[in-house]
């Protein structure tokens, strides 16, 4: 029997409030993180991801009080990211109630942090977030992928999508796995907030190159989009925000739709 796929709501938090952005820009207030987290937990979400989206760019600590409030309100696994730079930061987050930490900018800049985190907490606690954009500039040093738009490569971006790095996302995923990443949260910055579907080609390209679970993120607008990324995109989990926040498709409805489409989903 195939492993059950996971459905994961995401709380993008900016200064204590859940917001929703398009391409990580122009945030709009969407609700209170503790109230929304409890609602998702009660609705049957498999996990929850909490991302402090400005902690890295503002070079500040994560909002520990909000993390503690969310942890007390839910009964499902809980990943926290944004502003986690080292073992000390991760320990604070995990001691505040998180089950896993998501790391992004800090480990792109200092890759050995992945190994340090895995050595202390176990690789099952380390989620490596990869924010990527399509880059159509020919480059002999990159892994070119055949897509519907032609050959291109996927570039890692950091600081909430604000800074291009020149790093190939597929090569970075392989490196991060070797360093100790236990899971990847792959976000298409081209698709984020658009509600027109995930970047199937990005998700599939990374999934085919690593041997740890992949959470797909960026672009969910309807249940069919989740179906596509969980099947064609070979993702192990689908993360979404807008369709859940604005009640377009509540978690139970999405799960029911996916089951009817033949996807094995957790109860």
Question: Where is each model-derived feature located?
Answer:
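Conserved, mostly hydrophobic/aromatic
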Residues: 12, 40, 48, 80, ...
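Short, acidic/polar
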Residues: 29-41, 85-91, 165-175, 225-226
């Amino acid at each position: 029997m195939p492993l059950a796929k996971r459905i994961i709501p995401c709380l993008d938090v900016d200064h204590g409030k859940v917001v929703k952005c398009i391409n990580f820009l122009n945030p709009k207030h969407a609700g209170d993180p503790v109230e929304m987290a409890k609602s998702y937990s009660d609705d049957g979400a498999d996990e929850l991801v909490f991302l402090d989206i400005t902690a890295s760019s503002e070079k500040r600590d994560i909002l520990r009080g909000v993390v503690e409030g969310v942890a007390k309100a839910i009964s499902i696994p809980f990943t926290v990211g944004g502003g986690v730079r080292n073992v000390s930061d991760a320990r604070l987050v995990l001691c505040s109630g998180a089950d896993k930490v998501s790391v992004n900018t800090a480990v792109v800049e200092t890759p050995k942090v992945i190994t340090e985190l895995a050595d202390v907490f176990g690789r099952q606690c380390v989620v490596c977030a990869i924010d990527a954009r399509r880059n159509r500039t020919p480059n002999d040093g990159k892994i070119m992928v055949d897509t519907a738009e032609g050959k291109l490569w996927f570039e890692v971006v950091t600081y909430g999508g604000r800074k291009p790095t020149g790093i190939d996302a597929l090569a970075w995923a392989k490196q991060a796995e070797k360093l100790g990443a236990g899971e990847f949260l792959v976000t298409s910055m081209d698709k984020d907030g658009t509600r027109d579907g995930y970047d199937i080609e990005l998700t599939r390209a990374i999934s085919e190159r690593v041997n740890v679970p992949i959470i797909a993120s960026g672009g969910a607008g309807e249940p069919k989009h989740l179906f596509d990324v969980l099947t064609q995109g070979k993702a192990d989990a689908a993360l979404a925000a807008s369709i859940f926040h604005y009640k377009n498709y509540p978690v139970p409805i999405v799960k029911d739709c996916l089951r009817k489409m033949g996807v094995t989903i957790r109860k």
